[in-house]
Amino acid sequence: IEFHRDNAFKFRPSRQYDLIWSAGLFDYLDEKTFKMLLTKQLGFLKEGGEMVIGNFSLNNPTRDYMEFGNWFLHHRSPEELIQIACDCGISEDNINVKSESLGVNLFLHISK
């Protein structure tokens, strides 16, 4: 297992990975930037690998409090995450969206 804490836009790995996990990043990105970074990071994923991207769902009971404190995120639905992945050329057969038990955090799973 390797952990990288780096600028996601400048990161240039020397190899590909079996798993790429990203939490706390993509929900800050608008749709255009999300797609650009997703497409880039897919190139770092081995054939047969999996990418998991966390994103806050529309079902966030603390959203008003977060935004009152100037913490603004792009909350997305499972359907939006699937559409974004499809727009990046990923087959819907290779896409799955799961959530944790409260349904506040979504996880976009993409297999390559």
Regions found by a protein language model. Give the residues of each.
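Class I (Rossmann-like) S-adenosyl-L-methionine-dependent methyltransferase catalytic domain
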Residues: I1-R15, K32-M36, K40, E50-K112
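Conserved acidic residues
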Residues: D18
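Helix-to-beta-strand junctions that scaffold the AdoMet/dcAdoMet cofactor pocket
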Residues: L29-D30, L45-E47
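Hydrophobic adenine-recognition pocket in adenosine-nucleotide-binding enzymes
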Residues: L25
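A conserved beta-strand element that flanks and buttresses the S-adenosyl-L-methionine
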Residues: W21
